[in-house]
């Protein structure tokens, strides 16, 4: 990976961390909640550096530091969703970052990956990660995954998946889906 491209994005991530600490001393992202990230004045520079990594580097060469910071930035951009939208156009990056997000504590990144899985032309094994997101302890992550399932699976497949996931008989699942207007 070109060192300058990686370093530019990492510098932007550090800048964001520094801004967060200065603006909200001692508060974690989870403690802040809400839409606090929208006040960050350098989103355009950060977005540009992020896109440069996606377009100019190979996802397989990314190290854990870069992947963690990219997941962090996707999570912080949860109001605009620009980072995740751009990532869907780069399937190799989407796959690596989706796996990294699933293993992280970044619920704001997890729900975005769950929601955008249907839009990414990634491999089926990655699309099947929707089940991991559906079982996530964070209710919003789980709900967004369940909402994305119909776009990923045919109804019969979805019923089987929900049967396994929820331990509920198929007839009850179909009843719930009918009420939710997923099927007639």
Regions found by a protein language model. Name each.
Residues 21-28, 62, 82, 173:
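Residue-level signal for secondary-structure boundary elements
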Residues 1-47:
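Extended amphipathic alpha-helical repeat scaffolds
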Residues 19-22, 56, 60, 73, ...:
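Surface-exposed polar/charged interaction patches
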Residues 165-173:
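Accessory, usually C-terminal, subdomains that scaffold auxiliary metal cofactors
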Residues 33-56, 68-89, 108-122, 140-155, ...:
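Structural detector for internal amphipathic alpha-helices that build alpha-solenoid repeat scaffolds
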Residues 57-68, 90-103, 122-135, 154-166:
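Amphipathic alpha-helical scaffolding segments comprising HEAT/armadillo-like alpha-solenoid repeats
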């Amino acid at each position: 990976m070109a060192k300058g491209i990686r370093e530019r994005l990492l510098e932007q991530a550090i800048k964001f961390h520094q801004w967060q600490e200065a603006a909200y001393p001692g508060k974690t992202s989870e403690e802040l909640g809400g839409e606090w990230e929208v006040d960050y004045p350098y989103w355009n520079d950060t977005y540009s550096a992020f896109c440069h990594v996606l377009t100019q580097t190979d996802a397989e060469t990314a190290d854990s530091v870069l992947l963690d910071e990219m997941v962090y930035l996707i999570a912080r951009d949860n109001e605009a969703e620009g980072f995740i939208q751009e990532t869907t156009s780069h399937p190799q990056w989407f796959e690596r970052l989706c796996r990294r997000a699933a293993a992280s504590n970044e619920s704001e990144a997890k729900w975005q990956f769950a929601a955008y899985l249907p839009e990414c032309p990634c491999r089926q094994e990655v699309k099947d990660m929707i089940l991991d997101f559906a079982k996530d302890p964070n209710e919003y992550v789980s709900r967004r995954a369940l909402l994305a399932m119909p776009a990923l699976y045919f109804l019969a497949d979805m019923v089987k998946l929900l049967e396994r996931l929820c331990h509920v008989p198929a007839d009850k699942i179909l009843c719930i889906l009918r009420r939710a207007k997923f099927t007639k």
